[in-house]
Amino acid sequence: MPVDEQPTTPEAVQWRTIEDLPIHPSWRKVLEPVMDQIRDLGQFLTAETQAGRGFLPPEPDIFRAFSYPFEEVKVLILGQDPYPTPGHSMGLCFSTQPGVRPLPRSLVNIFKEMATDLGVSINATDGDLRPWSRQGVMLLNRVLTVQPGNSNSHKGRGWEAVTEAAITALGQRDQPLVAILWGRQAQAVQKFLGDTPCITSAHPSPLSASRGFFGSRPFSTTNRMLDDLGATPVDWRL
C-alpha cells in the first residue's frame, strides 16, 4: 500500500463465522470461543466506515498475525495497537508496509538495539518484519485496529478479549515459547502466559527507550532462552 494511499473503506466487515476470518486453520479452535466478540467488532468497524472515520489496517490485514501456524509460534512480541498513519500499519505489531519512509521512531530504536545486541550492521530497507513472522515470531498487537490519526482509539472496544484468548492459548501449550514484553501495557498480559519465560523492559518509544530499553539485549536473550528450551534460535537479521 503506497504511503500516500488512504485507508480502505469497505461497506461492511463480514465476519459471521470463524471460517470467514483470514487466519491459519490452526487458530480457529483458539478464536472460536470469542467469535461473538469478533462479530461485534465487525459491526463496530462497519459503523466506523459508514460514519466516515474508517479504520486501519485495511480489513485483509487485521488478522495477519494469525496467518502463521499456531503450533509454530515460539516467540511472542506484544504491541499496543496499529500505527495510526495511513499506509504504515499492516497487521503485525511494530512492522510497517514495505517502502515506508521515514520509519516509525519506535522501530528505529528496535533496530538500534538489535544492532548493538547482536553486533551486526542493520541495513533494513524498510520496516517489514515478516521475515521474523515466518520463523515463528508472533507480532501481536493487543488491539488490532485503530482510527486513522487517533492512536489507542479502539482500546476497550473488544479486541482485548480476542487477543487475551490467543495469548492464554499460547501460554498453555506444551511447546517452547518466549515472550518479549516492552512497556507496562504489554507486561500486563504476563498473567495470561503461565510459566512462559518473559523478557521485560521499557518500551522502545522515544519517550521511554533510554529508561531501560536500550541495553536490555532482548534478541540475544531470546535466542539463549530458545536454545535452553530446545528450539531453533531466530535469525533477526532482515
UniProtKB/Swiss-Prot annotation:
List of catalytic residues: 81
GO molecular function per UniProt: uracil DNA N-glycosylase activity
EC class (word): hydrolase
Subcellular location, principal: cytoplasm
Coiled-coil stretches: none
E.C. number(s) listed in UniProt: 3.2.2.27
PROSITE patterns given in the database record: U_DNA_GLYCOSYLASE
Key words of the record: Cytoplasm, DNA damage, DNA repair, Hydrolase
A Pfam family that the UniProt record links to this protein: UDG
GO biological process, any: base-excision repair, AP site formation via deaminated base removal
Transmembrane segment boundaries: none
Enzymatic reactions: Hydrolyzes single-stranded DNA or mismatched double-stranded DNA and polynucleotides, releasing free uracil
Matching SMART domains: UDG, UreE_C
InterPro entries with a match to the protein in the record: UDG_fam1, Ura-DNA_Glyclase_AS, Uracil-DNA_glycosylase-like, Uracil-DNA_glycosylase-like_sf
Cellular-component GO terms for this entry: cytoplasm
Cellular compartments annotated: Cytoplasm
Protein function: Excises uracil residues from the DNA which can arise as a result of misincorporation of dUMP residues by DNA polymerase or due to deamination of cytosine.
Entries under HAMAP family matching the protein: UDG
PANTHER family: URACIL-DNA GLYCOSYLASE
Family listed: Belongs to the uracil-DNA glycosylase (UDG) superfamily. UNG family.
Name listed for the protein in its UniProt record: Uracil-DNA glycosylase
Lineage: Bacteria, Bacillati, Actinomycetota, Actinomycetes, Mycobacteriales
Gene this chain is encoded by: ung
